[in-house]
Amino acid sequence: MSVDGRASIMHRLADLIESNVDDISLIECLDMGMRHESLRNRVIPRGARNFRSYADIAKEYKPRKWHSNTTKNEIQRMPSGISVIITPWNAPFMLSTWKCAPALAAGNSVILKPAEWSPLSASLLGDLIDEAGFPAGVFNIVQGIGEEVGAILVSDPNVNRVSFTGSPEAARHIGKSAAENITPFTGELGGKSPLIIFPDVDLEVAVAKAVGQFDDSGQICLAGTRLLVHSSIKKEFLNRFLELTAEQKLGSSFDDETEITPMIHPDHLQSVAGFVDRARINGDKVLCGGRVFKDDKLWYEPTLIEPVSNQSEVVQKEIFGPVLTLQTFDTESEAIELANSTEYGLAGMLYTKNRGIAERVGRAIRAGTVWVNCFLIRDLTAPFGGFGLSGIGREGGDYGIDFHSDLKTFQILDDSLSE
Protein backbone atom coordinates (compact mmCIF):
# COMPACT_ATOMS: atom_id res chain seq x y z
CA MET A 1 0.00 0.00 0.00
CA SER A 2 1.26 3.49 -0.83
CA VAL A 3 2.04 6.08 1.80
CA ASP A 4 -0.94 8.13 0.61
CA GLY A 5 -3.18 5.08 0.95
CA ARG A 6 -2.02 4.42 4.50
CA ALA A 7 -2.45 8.07 5.42
CA SER A 8 -6.00 8.11 4.07
CA ILE A 9 -6.99 5.09 6.17
CA MET A 10 -5.33 6.59 9.25
CA HIS A 11 -7.32 9.80 8.84
CA ARG A 12 -10.47 7.69 8.48
CA LEU A 13 -9.56 5.92 11.72
CA ALA A 14 -9.10 9.29 13.44
CA ASP A 15 -12.60 10.26 12.28
CA LEU A 16 -13.99 7.06 13.78
CA ILE A 17 -12.24 7.67 17.10
CA GLU A 18 -13.71 11.17 17.26
CA SER A 19 -17.21 9.91 16.48
CA ASN A 20 -16.91 7.19 19.14
CA VAL A 21 -15.36 9.30 21.90
CA ASP A 22 -18.25 8.70 24.30
CA ASP A 23 -18.11 4.91 24.02
CA ILE A 24 -14.32 4.76 24.24
CA SER A 25 -14.30 7.09 27.24
CA LEU A 26 -16.90 5.00 29.03
CA ILE A 27 -15.00 1.76 28.51
CA GLU A 28 -11.68 3.33 29.49
CA CYS A 29 -13.15 4.89 32.62
CA LEU A 30 -14.70 1.62 33.76
CA ASP A 31 -11.54 -0.32 32.97
CA MET A 32 -8.83 1.81 34.58
CA GLY A 33 -10.52 4.57 36.57
CA MET A 34 -9.27 7.77 34.94
CA ARG A 35 -11.67 10.69 35.29
CA HIS A 36 -14.37 10.43 32.61
CA GLU A 37 -14.31 14.16 31.90
CA SER A 38 -10.58 14.04 31.15
CA LEU A 39 -10.98 11.02 28.92
CA ARG A 40 -13.87 12.48 26.96
CA ASN A 41 -12.43 15.95 26.45
CA ARG A 42 -8.68 15.41 26.22
CA VAL A 43 -7.23 11.91 26.42
CA ILE A 44 -9.32 10.03 23.84
CA PRO A 45 -9.33 12.93 21.33
CA ARG A 46 -5.53 12.84 21.64
CA GLY A 47 -5.74 9.30 20.23
CA ALA A 48 -7.29 10.68 17.05
CA ARG A 49 -4.59 13.35 16.90
CA ASN A 50 -1.92 10.67 17.12
CA PHE A 51 -3.15 8.98 13.95
CA ARG A 52 -3.65 12.25 12.09
CA SER A 53 -0.21 13.50 13.06
CA TYR A 54 1.60 10.37 11.92
CA ALA A 55 -0.42 10.14 8.72
CA ASP A 56 0.66 13.66 7.81
CA ILE A 57 4.28 13.11 8.89
CA ALA A 58 4.51 10.02 6.67
CA LYS A 59 3.05 11.87 3.67
CA GLU A 60 5.36 14.84 4.11
CA TYR A 61 8.52 12.73 4.30
CA LYS A 62 11.00 13.59 1.56
CA PRO A 63 13.95 11.21 1.12
CA ARG A 64 17.30 12.93 1.31
CA LYS A 65 19.01 13.10 -2.09
CA TRP A 66 22.46 14.46 -2.90
CA HIS A 67 25.44 14.13 -5.21
CA SER A 68 28.93 13.34 -3.96
CA ASN A 69 32.04 12.70 -6.01
CA THR A 70 30.81 10.37 -8.77
CA THR A 71 27.49 9.05 -7.42
CA LYS A 72 23.91 10.12 -6.99
CA ASN A 73 22.76 9.21 -3.46
CA GLU A 74 19.38 8.73 -1.83
CA ILE A 75 18.28 7.58 1.63
CA GLN A 76 15.22 5.35 1.35
CA ARG A 77 12.96 4.64 4.32
CA MET A 78 11.40 1.18 4.13
CA PRO A 79 8.99 -0.77 6.36
CA SER A 80 10.88 -3.02 8.76
CA GLY A 81 8.19 -5.71 8.93
CA ILE A 82 6.41 -6.69 12.14
CA SER A 83 6.26 -4.36 15.15
CA VAL A 84 5.31 -5.67 18.59
CA ILE A 85 3.75 -2.95 20.75
CA ILE A 86 3.43 -3.53 24.50
CA THR A 87 1.41 -0.90 26.35
CA PRO A 88 0.87 -0.10 30.07
CA TRP A 89 -2.34 -0.02 32.06
CA ASN A 90 -2.51 3.77 32.49
CA ALA A 91 -4.21 5.67 29.62
CA PRO A 92 -4.14 2.46 27.56
CA PHE A 93 -6.17 3.66 24.56
CA MET A 94 -4.21 6.85 24.04
CA LEU A 95 -0.86 5.13 24.54
CA SER A 96 -1.83 2.32 22.17
CA THR A 97 -2.61 4.88 19.46
CA TRP A 98 0.61 6.79 20.23
CA LYS A 99 2.74 3.67 19.82
CA CYS A 100 0.86 1.92 17.00
CA ALA A 101 0.43 4.97 14.76
CA PRO A 102 4.12 5.36 13.78
CA ALA A 103 4.44 1.63 13.08
CA LEU A 104 1.38 1.68 10.82
CA ALA A 105 2.54 4.90 9.16
CA ALA A 106 5.87 3.21 8.41
CA GLY A 107 4.01 0.41 6.61
CA ASN A 108 4.51 -2.29 9.23
CA SER A 109 2.15 -4.91 10.53
CA VAL A 110 1.43 -4.50 14.24
CA ILE A 111 0.88 -6.90 17.12
CA LEU A 112 -0.51 -5.02 20.13
CA LYS A 113 -0.17 -6.56 23.59
CA PRO A 114 -2.16 -4.42 26.09
CA ALA A 115 -1.71 -4.61 29.86
CA GLU A 116 -3.81 -7.26 31.56
CA TRP A 117 -5.23 -4.76 34.09
CA SER A 118 -6.84 -2.58 31.38
CA PRO A 119 -7.36 -4.64 28.22
CA LEU A 120 -10.79 -3.54 27.01
CA SER A 121 -10.10 -0.44 24.92
CA ALA A 122 -7.48 -2.28 22.84
CA SER A 123 -10.20 -4.56 21.50
CA LEU A 124 -12.33 -1.53 20.67
CA LEU A 125 -9.36 0.01 18.84
CA GLY A 126 -9.10 -3.19 16.80
CA ASP A 127 -12.76 -2.91 15.81
CA LEU A 128 -12.28 0.69 14.69
CA ILE A 129 -9.15 -0.23 12.71
CA ASP A 130 -11.13 -2.90 10.86
CA GLU A 131 -13.92 -0.43 10.17
CA ALA A 132 -11.43 2.15 8.89
CA GLY A 133 -10.30 -0.26 6.18
CA PHE A 134 -6.87 -1.52 7.18
CA PRO A 135 -6.13 -4.79 5.34
CA ALA A 136 -6.73 -7.98 7.31
CA GLY A 137 -3.66 -9.03 9.27
CA VAL A 138 -2.08 -5.59 9.43
CA PHE A 139 -3.28 -4.97 12.99
CA ASN A 140 -3.44 -7.77 15.52
CA ILE A 141 -4.20 -7.93 19.25
CA VAL A 142 -2.90 -10.53 21.68
CA GLN A 143 -4.39 -10.45 25.17
CA GLY A 144 -2.77 -12.16 28.13
CA ILE A 145 -0.31 -12.03 31.01
CA GLY A 146 2.85 -10.12 30.18
CA GLU A 147 5.29 -12.65 31.60
CA GLU A 148 3.74 -15.32 29.39
CA VAL A 149 2.36 -13.77 26.20
CA GLY A 150 4.71 -10.80 26.07
CA ALA A 151 7.75 -13.02 26.54
CA ILE A 152 6.75 -15.16 23.55
CA LEU A 153 6.20 -12.14 21.32
CA VAL A 154 9.45 -10.31 22.04
CA SER A 155 11.57 -13.45 21.66
CA ASP A 156 10.11 -14.45 18.29
CA PRO A 157 12.76 -14.17 15.55
CA ASN A 158 10.11 -13.06 13.04
CA VAL A 159 9.51 -9.84 14.98
CA ASN A 160 11.40 -6.85 13.57
CA ARG A 161 10.74 -4.14 16.18
CA VAL A 162 9.68 -4.06 19.84
CA SER A 163 8.23 -0.91 21.41
CA PHE A 164 7.42 -1.00 25.12
CA THR A 165 6.07 1.33 27.78
CA GLY A 166 6.25 0.16 31.38
CA SER A 167 8.64 -0.49 34.22
CA PRO A 168 12.45 -0.67 34.01
CA GLU A 169 12.31 -4.15 35.52
CA ALA A 170 10.10 -5.47 32.71
CA ALA A 171 12.16 -3.57 30.14
CA ARG A 172 15.32 -5.39 31.20
CA HIS A 173 13.68 -8.75 30.50
CA ILE A 174 12.22 -7.56 27.20
CA GLY A 175 15.50 -6.01 26.11
CA LYS A 176 17.41 -9.22 26.83
CA SER A 177 14.91 -11.31 24.86
CA ALA A 178 14.95 -8.90 21.93
CA ALA A 179 18.74 -8.85 21.98
CA GLU A 180 18.88 -12.61 21.37
CA ASN A 181 17.57 -11.91 17.85
CA ILE A 182 19.21 -8.46 17.54
CA THR A 183 15.69 -6.97 17.39
CA PRO A 184 15.69 -3.18 17.81
CA PHE A 185 13.95 -2.18 21.03
CA THR A 186 12.65 1.10 22.37
CA GLY A 187 11.23 1.69 25.84
CA GLU A 188 9.60 4.49 27.80
CA LEU A 189 10.14 3.41 31.38
CA GLY A 190 8.64 5.92 33.75
CA GLY A 191 9.93 8.85 35.71
CA LYS A 192 10.61 10.65 38.95
CA SER A 193 10.36 14.16 37.58
CA PRO A 194 11.35 17.30 39.50
CA LEU A 195 9.02 20.29 39.76
CA ILE A 196 11.22 23.26 40.68
CA ILE A 197 9.66 26.41 42.14
CA PHE A 198 11.72 29.59 42.35
CA PRO A 199 10.83 32.45 44.74
CA ASP A 200 9.76 34.92 42.03
CA VAL A 201 6.74 32.90 40.91
CA ASP A 202 3.04 33.58 41.34
CA LEU A 203 2.68 31.29 44.34
CA GLU A 204 -1.01 30.57 43.73
CA VAL A 205 -0.21 29.27 40.26
CA ALA A 206 2.76 27.24 41.49
CA VAL A 207 0.78 25.64 44.30
CA ALA A 208 -2.07 24.76 41.93
CA LYS A 209 0.38 23.12 39.53
CA ALA A 210 1.99 21.19 42.37
CA VAL A 211 -1.33 19.90 43.70
CA GLY A 212 -2.28 19.09 40.11
CA GLN A 213 0.37 16.36 40.11
CA PHE A 214 -2.13 14.26 42.07
CA ASP A 215 -4.26 14.01 38.91
CA ASP A 216 -5.29 10.46 38.01
CA SER A 217 -4.07 9.51 41.51
CA GLY A 218 -0.50 10.14 40.39
CA GLN A 219 -0.61 7.32 37.84
CA ILE A 220 1.08 9.47 35.18
CA CYS A 221 4.67 8.79 34.17
CA LEU A 222 5.38 12.48 33.49
CA ALA A 223 4.10 13.73 36.86
CA GLY A 224 6.34 16.09 38.81
CA THR A 225 6.48 14.01 41.95
CA ARG A 226 9.55 15.70 43.48
CA LEU A 227 8.68 19.23 44.59
CA LEU A 228 11.85 21.33 44.85
CA VAL A 229 10.94 24.64 46.48
CA HIS A 230 13.20 27.59 47.24
CA SER A 231 13.76 27.69 51.00
CA SER A 232 12.65 31.33 51.27
CA ILE A 233 9.08 30.44 50.25
CA LYS A 234 8.83 26.97 51.76
CA LYS A 235 6.59 27.93 54.69
CA GLU A 236 4.08 29.88 52.62
CA PHE A 237 4.13 27.30 49.84
CA LEU A 238 3.55 24.43 52.26
CA ASN A 239 0.66 26.17 54.03
CA ARG A 240 -1.12 26.86 50.77
CA PHE A 241 -0.33 23.41 49.40
CA LEU A 242 -1.84 21.71 52.45
CA GLU A 243 -4.93 23.92 52.28
CA LEU A 244 -5.55 23.15 48.62
CA THR A 245 -4.81 19.45 49.03
CA ALA A 246 -7.34 19.23 51.86
CA GLU A 247 -9.97 20.52 49.42
CA GLN A 248 -9.33 17.76 46.87
CA LYS A 249 -12.40 15.60 46.37
CA LEU A 250 -11.93 11.84 46.33
CA GLY A 251 -14.74 10.16 44.47
CA SER A 252 -16.20 8.51 41.41
CA SER A 253 -14.42 8.86 38.09
CA PHE A 254 -17.79 9.76 36.56
CA ASP A 255 -18.18 12.79 38.83
CA ASP A 256 -16.76 15.85 37.06
CA GLU A 257 -15.97 17.43 40.44
CA THR A 258 -13.73 14.53 41.49
CA GLU A 259 -10.04 15.38 41.70
CA ILE A 260 -8.66 12.14 43.17
CA THR A 261 -9.86 9.09 41.28
CA PRO A 262 -9.61 5.41 42.25
CA MET A 263 -6.37 3.58 41.59
CA ILE A 264 -6.09 0.89 38.94
CA HIS A 265 -6.05 -2.16 41.24
CA PRO A 266 -5.96 -3.06 44.96
CA ASP A 267 -2.52 -4.61 44.44
CA HIS A 268 -1.18 -1.33 43.13
CA LEU A 269 -2.71 0.58 46.04
CA GLN A 270 -0.90 -1.75 48.41
CA SER A 271 2.34 -1.08 46.55
CA VAL A 272 1.86 2.67 47.00
CA ALA A 273 0.92 2.24 50.66
CA GLY A 274 4.07 0.17 51.17
CA PHE A 275 6.26 3.06 50.02
CA VAL A 276 4.63 5.39 52.53
CA ASP A 277 4.82 2.86 55.36
CA ARG A 278 8.53 2.35 54.73
CA ALA A 279 9.03 6.11 54.57
CA ARG A 280 7.62 6.45 58.09
CA ILE A 281 9.94 3.72 59.33
CA ASN A 282 12.84 5.51 57.62
CA GLY A 283 12.03 8.70 59.54
CA ASP A 284 10.58 10.65 56.62
CA LYS A 285 7.86 13.09 57.68
CA VAL A 286 4.38 12.58 56.25
CA LEU A 287 2.93 16.09 56.00
CA CYS A 288 -0.51 15.08 54.74
CA GLY A 289 -2.39 11.98 53.65
CA GLY A 290 -0.43 8.80 54.02
CA ARG A 291 -3.29 6.37 54.37
CA VAL A 292 -6.01 4.52 52.52
CA PHE A 293 -9.14 6.65 52.21
CA LYS A 294 -11.85 5.39 54.59
CA ASP A 295 -10.47 1.84 54.43
CA ASP A 296 -11.37 1.63 50.74
CA LYS A 297 -9.37 -0.70 48.51
CA LEU A 298 -8.95 1.72 45.59
CA TRP A 299 -8.53 5.28 46.95
CA TYR A 300 -5.37 6.54 48.60
CA GLU A 301 -5.25 9.99 50.14
CA PRO A 302 -3.06 12.59 48.39
CA THR A 303 0.21 12.47 50.28
CA LEU A 304 3.16 14.82 50.75
CA ILE A 305 6.37 13.58 52.37
CA GLU A 306 9.39 15.54 53.57
CA PRO A 307 12.28 13.07 53.34
CA VAL A 308 15.12 12.90 55.83
CA SER A 309 17.60 12.75 52.97
CA ASN A 310 17.80 12.80 49.21
CA GLN A 311 18.55 9.07 49.33
CA SER A 312 15.17 8.18 50.83
CA GLU A 313 13.31 5.55 48.84
CA VAL A 314 10.36 7.87 48.22
CA VAL A 315 12.72 10.32 46.51
CA GLN A 316 14.66 7.83 44.43
CA LYS A 317 12.02 5.31 43.33
CA GLU A 318 8.98 5.71 41.10
CA ILE A 319 5.87 5.20 43.26
CA PHE A 320 3.23 5.84 40.58
CA GLY A 321 0.61 6.99 43.03
CA PRO A 322 -0.65 10.16 44.75
CA VAL A 323 2.59 10.63 46.68
CA LEU A 324 4.84 13.69 46.32
CA THR A 325 8.02 14.66 48.15
CA LEU A 326 9.05 18.14 49.30
CA GLN A 327 12.68 19.32 49.34
CA THR A 328 14.20 22.78 49.46
CA PHE A 329 17.13 24.52 47.77
CA ASP A 330 18.91 27.85 48.13
CA THR A 331 20.81 28.22 44.85
CA GLU A 332 20.36 27.36 41.19
CA SER A 333 23.20 24.87 41.35
CA GLU A 334 21.60 23.13 44.31
CA ALA A 335 18.27 22.94 42.46
CA ILE A 336 19.99 21.44 39.43
CA GLU A 337 21.89 18.94 41.57
CA LEU A 338 18.68 17.78 43.25
CA ALA A 339 16.80 17.65 39.96
CA ASN A 340 19.45 15.37 38.43
CA SER A 341 20.00 13.20 41.50
CA THR A 342 17.87 10.19 40.55
CA GLU A 343 18.38 7.47 37.94
CA TYR A 344 15.35 8.75 36.03
CA GLY A 345 15.19 11.49 33.42
CA LEU A 346 11.81 11.54 31.70
CA ALA A 347 10.72 15.13 32.34
CA GLY A 348 11.28 18.24 34.41
CA MET A 349 9.27 21.35 35.24
CA LEU A 350 10.35 24.70 36.56
CA TYR A 351 8.42 27.81 37.51
CA THR A 352 10.08 31.22 37.38
CA LYS A 353 9.57 34.63 35.80
CA ASN A 354 13.29 35.03 35.15
CA ARG A 355 14.40 34.16 31.61
CA GLY A 356 18.00 33.63 32.66
CA ILE A 357 17.03 31.15 35.36
CA ALA A 358 14.72 29.35 32.95
CA GLU A 359 17.43 29.03 30.30
CA ARG A 360 20.23 27.99 32.66
CA VAL A 361 18.30 25.55 34.79
CA GLY A 362 16.16 24.19 31.97
CA ARG A 363 19.19 23.35 29.86
CA ALA A 364 20.97 21.75 32.83
CA ILE A 365 18.14 19.35 33.72
CA ARG A 366 18.86 15.90 32.33
CA ALA A 367 15.46 14.89 31.02
CA GLY A 368 13.80 14.12 27.72
CA THR A 369 11.28 16.95 28.11
CA VAL A 370 11.54 20.11 30.20
CA TRP A 371 8.59 22.46 30.65
CA VAL A 372 8.94 26.05 31.85
CA ASN A 373 5.81 27.52 33.49
CA CYS A 374 3.63 24.80 31.95
CA PHE A 375 2.99 21.06 32.05
CA LEU A 376 1.84 18.34 29.63
CA ILE A 377 1.89 20.57 26.57
CA ARG A 378 2.92 18.31 23.70
CA ASP A 379 3.98 18.89 20.11
CA LEU A 380 3.54 15.50 18.48
CA THR A 381 6.36 16.14 16.02
CA ALA A 382 8.90 16.56 18.84
CA PRO A 383 10.96 13.62 20.16
CA PHE A 384 9.62 11.97 23.30
CA GLY A 385 11.58 9.73 25.62
CA GLY A 386 13.84 9.77 28.63
CA PHE A 387 17.37 9.82 29.91
CA GLY A 388 18.83 7.10 32.12
CA LEU A 389 16.34 4.72 33.69
CA SER A 390 13.45 6.52 31.97
CA GLY A 391 14.08 4.75 28.72
CA ILE A 392 15.88 4.08 25.51
CA GLY A 393 15.07 5.53 22.09
CA ARG A 394 12.62 8.24 21.09
CA GLU A 395 9.05 8.41 19.85
CA GLY A 396 7.30 11.33 18.19
CA GLY A 397 7.47 12.77 14.68
CA ASP A 398 10.02 11.31 12.27
CA TYR A 399 11.82 9.78 15.25
CA GLY A 400 8.91 7.37 15.76
CA ILE A 401 8.59 6.37 12.11
CA ASP A 402 12.36 6.00 11.73
CA PHE A 403 12.42 3.46 14.57
CA HIS A 404 9.88 1.26 12.78
CA SER A 405 11.72 1.60 9.45
CA ASP A 406 14.84 0.31 7.79
CA LEU A 407 16.96 3.01 6.19
CA LYS A 408 18.77 2.19 2.96
CA THR A 409 21.48 4.21 1.23
CA PHE A 410 20.93 3.91 -2.54
CA GLN A 411 23.83 4.98 -4.80
CA ILE A 412 24.11 5.14 -8.59
CA LEU A 413 27.38 5.75 -10.41
CA ASP A 414 27.23 8.80 -12.64
CA ASP A 415 26.63 8.14 -16.35
CA SER A 416 26.43 4.38 -15.75
CA LEU A 417 22.78 3.91 -16.76
CA SER A 418 21.04 4.40 -20.08
CA GLU A 419 17.46 5.54 -20.47
Regions found by a protein language model. Name each.
Residues 1-71:
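N-terminal Rossmann-like NAD(P)+-binding subdomain of aldehyde/semialdehyde dehydrogenases
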Residues 3, 21, 203, 234, ...:
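Residues at or immediately preceding the N-termini of alpha-helices
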Residues 6, 28, 51, 107, ...:
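Residue-level signal for inorganic ion chemistry
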Residues 15-22, 33, 37, 56, ...:
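Generic secondary-structure signature for well-ordered alpha-helical cores
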Residues 18, 62-205, 329:
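Rossmann-like NAD(P) dinucleotide-binding subdomain of oxidoreductase/dehydrogenase enzymes
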Residues 51, 122-125, 153, 174, ...:
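Hydrophobic packing residues within well-ordered alpha-helices of enzyme cores
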Residues 159, 196, 249, 276, ...:
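Conserved C-terminal structural/oligomerization subdomain of aldehyde/semialdehyde dehydrogenase
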